[in-house]
A protein has these predicted regions:
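Beta-strand elements of well-folded, non-transmembrane domains
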Residues: 99-101, 116, 131
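Short beta-strand-centered aromatic/proline hotspots
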Residues: 106-115
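Bacterial N-terminal signal peptides that target proteins for export
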Residues: 1-8
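Bacterial N-terminal signal peptides
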Residues: 8-16
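Acidic, glycine-rich low-complexity segments with interspersed aromatic residues
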Residues: 26-101
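Exposed beta-strand and adjacent loop surfaces of beta-rich binding modules
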Residues: 90-94, 109, 143-145
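C-terminal motif of bacterial Sec signal peptides marking the signal peptidase cleavage site
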Residues: 18-20
Length: 160
């Protein structure tokens, strides 16, 4: 009986230690972002999004899926926060839409080099087009989406 009780105590202690270690090493959720726009224009190293929305969507991946709507203002303010900020390590993004000129789908891989700046009717980013992307000097799109991949472990909904 004494051995059985000792075993149970040791097992419970081990489980408790594993749980507390797991909590200490658990990383913050990595949030990805989506901005929708009525129109988009990619011209040189600038991306202009025309949108009525003052918010963007945020979500996490499996296994603990979460989602939220956050203001562009709060997201912009967080651009240079943390040791691994977007300012220090610009995020990859994909711009998806339909080319206004020929109605063909367009997918352009970019890097967002700056926080968005509010302009008449929307927002403007400084961007860098990635290798293999459509390098036309000007691309105009109708309804568009920009998916922003967050590799940062410091930019989180919890910190906004």
């Amino acid at each position: 009986m004494r051995k059985c009780i000792t075993f149970i105590i040791l097992a419970l202690t081990a489980c408790s230690l594993m749980t507390s270690c797991d909590k200490q090493t658990k990383k913050a959720d990595a949030w990805d972002f989506v901005i929708t726009a009525k129109e988009a224009e990619l011209k040189g190293d600038q991306l202009t999004l025309i949108t009525n929305s003052e918010h963007l969507f945020a979500f996490t991946d499996r296994p603990n899926r979460k989602f939220a709507s956050i203001s562009m203002e709060d997201w912009t303010k967080s651009w240079n926060k943390g040791s691994d900020s977007f300012e220090k390590d610009p995020p990859n993004a994909v711009l998806v839409g339909t080319n206004s000129a020929d109605e063909k789908e367009v997918l352009v891989e970019i890097e967002l080099m700056s926080a968005p700046v509010k302009v008449a009717g929307g927002y403007r980013f400084q961007i860098k087009r990635m290798t293999g992307s459509d390098h036309q000097s000007v691309v105009r799109m109708g309804r568009s989406f920009i998916y922003i991949d967050n590799e940062s472990d410091t930019l989180s909904i919890d910190t906004l």
